[in-house]
């Protein structure tokens, strides 16, 4: 920097520092910078020269010191001043200029290019060529390095504006023609073509049909009080069961008869995955009072009872051997003492022996009589137990056990939760529910219990009213007489039903 300019910059900085109370001057809103003040000049001069318009030059004499105005101050050595930097760059351009090449947009330039063609159509390369040849701004930007930006903008405008249409070029190896829309098109941009075509595109429909068909790992639980009417509800409850069923087979299950809606019709000796005990306790709880049992027999229980129709059970004496299955124990409600659990048997043995006349069913009332009877059997003669679950995809195992009429339960009934406690595989079983209704509930229905509560009598009557020592499910399965063709044809077509009459090793 020469000494004269350096001196001028120093003087301008000093003048600005000496006037700390500089207040903005009133000016029209269209003016960006304030008009120069006369007191900032270094020497007297005419007012007409002091207050020039923003785009005019200040006349100066060759022998005199140049007039220092805020719009003409050189840049100080300490850094650019905000008000000085904008004025040094040159006069302010007109506000009507929208782009670097003028006031016309890309779409207007493209329209001019197409209209200038004899056939009123141009290819994309011809539009590029017209831009470089006609518009001065693009004359030096025709090479590949400097033309990437504006050529990309032209392609966007051709695609997004409805005033341009693309016509197929019949010549081999030629790009398509771009023409002006004869209908005029809209002034603004057309909606994106991809978004407009997605709704009616067959490609989208194919994409939807090819979506993942895996069953959800966590299925919503049915609302409280809802009763499942088909095995599909149980399958949703036990989503991790080995049987490969999912929601897509709902239409298959709806055509079956009502008796197939119970899980007891699925015969298998394999244990299914079971839910944690906390989930069972939270979802299904025993009502606190016996008055809530008023009404008829629950529909689900009726369907479960229908399922046992036609099944001939083995002799009670053949069911006393030890079972190879694991995980359950049972205690008669009338017995005192701790609840025993054994990992190697289905029902834990009870001290003492059964008399020859005692078995799973009473001699006075057979299973067929219980099932075909219109009225519910006397509560004192029926013992219902429920295991949740024991069969594959069958959370319900319904057993009807006869109790001698001499074993009369007391009128006082207490609810006592008795969760199963046992080592080994028995921990997989959440709960075993035993219900023996007292005579006072003879008119009440028999509810379906899935939780832990047990209706037990406070009276400890008789040492001979006990359950069988063990119930061998393998023996039960081997001696089961049923119409296998009927079960297979009703339940499924050979996929998930696992009939295995061989005892597990």
UniProtKB/Swiss-Prot annotation:
<dbReference type="GO" id="GO:0005829">
    <property type="term" value="C:cytosol"/>
</dbReference>
<dbReference type="Pfam" id="PF16676">
    <property type="entry name" value="FOXO-TAD"/>
</dbReference>
<keyword id="KW-0832">Ubl conjugation</keyword>
<feature type="compositionally biased region" description="Polar residues">
    <location>
        <begin position="257"/>
        <end position="271"/>
    </location>
</feature>
<feature type="modified residue" description="Phosphothreonine; by PKB/AKT1">
    <location>
        <position position="32"/>
    </location>
</feature>
<dbReference type="InterPro" id="IPR047409">
    <property type="entry name" value="FH_FOXO4"/>
</dbReference>
<feature type="region of interest" description="Disordered">
    <location>
        <begin position="257"/>
        <end position="276"/>
    </location>
</feature>
<dbReference type="InterPro" id="IPR001766">
    <property type="entry name" value="Fork_head_dom"/>
</dbReference>
<dbReference type="GO" id="GO:0008286">
    <property type="term" value="P:insulin receptor signaling pathway"/>
</dbReference>
<keyword id="KW-0804">Transcription</keyword>
<keyword id="KW-0131">Cell cycle</keyword>
<feature type="modified residue" description="Phosphoserine; by PKB/AKT1">
    <location>
        <position position="197"/>
    </location>
</feature>
<keyword id="KW-0805">Transcription regulation</keyword>
<feature type="region of interest" description="Required for interaction with FOXK1">
    <location>
        <begin position="97"/>
        <end position="215"/>
    </location>
</feature>
<keyword id="KW-0963">Cytoplasm</keyword>
<dbReference type="GO" id="GO:0014911">
    <property type="term" value="P:positive regulation of smooth muscle cell migration"/>
</dbReference>
<keyword id="KW-0517">Myogenesis</keyword>
<keyword id="KW-0221">Differentiation</keyword>
<dbReference type="GO" id="GO:0043565">
    <property type="term" value="F:sequence-specific DNA binding"/>
</dbReference>
<dbReference type="GO" id="GO:0007095">
    <property type="term" value="P:mitotic G2 DNA damage checkpoint signaling"/>
</dbReference>
<dbReference type="InterPro" id="IPR036390">
    <property type="entry name" value="WH_DNA-bd_sf"/>
</dbReference>
<dbReference type="GO" id="GO:0051151">
    <property type="term" value="P:negative regulation of smooth muscle cell differentiation"/>
</dbReference>
<dbReference type="InterPro" id="IPR030456">
    <property type="entry name" value="TF_fork_head_CS_2"/>
</dbReference>
<dbReference type="GO" id="GO:0016525">
    <property type="term" value="P:negative regulation of angiogenesis"/>
</dbReference>
<keyword id="KW-0539">Nucleus</keyword>
<dbReference type="InterPro" id="IPR032067">
    <property type="entry name" value="FOXO-TAD"/>
</dbReference>
<dbReference type="GO" id="GO:0042802">
    <property type="term" value="F:identical protein binding"/>
</dbReference>
<dbReference type="GO" id="GO:0008285">
    <property type="term" value="P:negative regulation of cell population proliferation"/>
</dbReference>
<keyword id="KW-0238">DNA-binding</keyword>
<dbReference type="GO" id="GO:0006355">
    <property type="term" value="P:regulation of DNA-templated transcription"/>
</dbReference>
<keyword id="KW-0007">Acetylation</keyword>
<dbReference type="GO" id="GO:1990841">
    <property type="term" value="F:promoter-specific chromatin binding"/>
</dbReference>
<dbReference type="GO" id="GO:0008013">
    <property type="term" value="F:beta-catenin binding"/>
</dbReference>
<protein>
    <recommendedName>
        <fullName>Forkhead box protein O4</fullName>
    </recommendedName>
</protein>
<dbReference type="GO" id="GO:0016607">
    <property type="term" value="C:nuclear speck"/>
</dbReference>
<dbReference type="GO" id="GO:1990837">
    <property type="term" value="F:sequence-specific double-stranded DNA binding"/>
</dbReference>
<feature type="region of interest" description="Disordered">
    <location>
        <begin position="1"/>
        <end position="66"/>
    </location>
</feature>
<dbReference type="GO" id="GO:0048863">
    <property type="term" value="P:stem cell differentiation"/>
</dbReference>
<dbReference type="GO" id="GO:0045893">
    <property type="term" value="P:positive regulation of DNA-templated transcription"/>
</dbReference>
<dbReference type="GO" id="GO:0005654">
    <property type="term" value="C:nucleoplasm"/>
</dbReference>
<dbReference type="GO" id="GO:0019899">
    <property type="term" value="F:enzyme binding"/>
</dbReference>
<comment type="function">
    <text>Transcription factor involved in the regulation of the insulin signaling pathway. Binds to insulin-response elements (IREs) and can activate transcription of IGFBP1. Down-regulates expression of HIF1A and suppresses hypoxia-induced transcriptional activation of HIF1A-modulated genes. Also involved in negative regulation of the cell cycle. Involved in increased proteasome activity in embryonic stem cells (ESCs) by activating expression of PSMD11 in ESCs, leading to enhanced assembly of the 26S proteasome, followed by higher proteasome activity.</text>
</comment>
């Amino acid at each position: 920097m020469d000494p004269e300019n350096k001196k001028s910059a120093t003087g301008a900085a000093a003048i600005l520092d000496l006037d700390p109370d500089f207040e903005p001057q009133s000016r029209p809103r269209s003016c960006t910078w304030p008009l120069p003040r006369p007191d900032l000049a270094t020497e007297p001069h005419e007012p007409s020269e002091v207050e020039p318009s923003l785009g005019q030059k200040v006349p100066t004499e060759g022998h005199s010191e140049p007039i220092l105005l805020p719009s003409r101050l050189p840049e100080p050595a300490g850094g650019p001043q905000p008000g000085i930097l904008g004025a040094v760059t040159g006069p302010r351009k007109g506000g009507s200029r929208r782009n670097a090449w003028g006031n016309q947009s890309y779409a207007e330039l493209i329209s001019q290019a197409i209209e200038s063609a004899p056939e009123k159509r141009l290819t994309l390369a011809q539009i590029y060529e017209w831009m470089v040849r006609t518009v001065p701004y693009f004359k030096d930007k025709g090479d590949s390095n400097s033309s990437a930006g504006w050529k990309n903008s032209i392609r966007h405008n051709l695609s997004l504006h409805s005033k341009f249409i693309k016509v197929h070029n019949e010549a081999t190896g030629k790009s398509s023609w771009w023409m002006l829309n004869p209908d005029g098109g809209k002034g603004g941009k057309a909606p994106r073509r991809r978004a407009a075509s997605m709704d009616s595109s067959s490609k989208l429909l194919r994409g939807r049909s090819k979506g993942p068909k895996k069953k959800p790992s966590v299925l919503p639980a049915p609302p409280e009080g809802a009763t499942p009417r088909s095995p599909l509800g149980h399958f949703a409850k036990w989503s991790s069961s080995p049987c490969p069923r999912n929601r897509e087979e709902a239409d298959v299950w709806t055509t079956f008869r009502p008796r197939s809606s119970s899980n007891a019709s699925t015969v298998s000796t394999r244990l299914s995955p079971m839910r944690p005990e906390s989930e069972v306790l939270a979802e299904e709880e025993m009502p606190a009072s016996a008055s809530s049992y008023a009404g008829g027999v629950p529909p689900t229980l009726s369907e479960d009872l229908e399922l046992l129709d036609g099944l001939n059970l083995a002799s009670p004496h053949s069911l006393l051997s030890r079972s190879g299955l694991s995980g359950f124990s049972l205690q008669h409600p009338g017995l005192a003492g701790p609840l025993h659990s054994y990992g190697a048997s289905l029902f834990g043995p009870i001290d003492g022996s059964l008399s020859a006349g005692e078995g799973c069913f009473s001699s006075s009332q057979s299973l067929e009589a219980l099932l075909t009877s219109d009225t519910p059997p006397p509560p004192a003669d029926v013992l219902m137990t429920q295991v949740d679950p024991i069969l594959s995809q069958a959370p319900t195992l319904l057993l009807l056990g006869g109790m001698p009429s001499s074993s009369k339960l007391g009128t006082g009934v207490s609810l006592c939760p008795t969760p199963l406690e046992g080592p080994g595989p028995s921990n997989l079983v959440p709960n075993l529910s035993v219900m023996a209704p007292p005579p006072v509930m003879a008119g009440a229905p028999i509810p379906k219990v899935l939780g832990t509560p047990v209706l037990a009598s406070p009276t400890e009557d008789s040492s001979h009213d006990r359950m069988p020592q063990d119930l061998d499910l393998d023996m039960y399965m081997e001696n089961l007489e049923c119409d296998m063709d009927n079960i297979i044809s009703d339940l499924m077509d050979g996929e998930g039903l696992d009939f295995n009459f061989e005892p597990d090793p």
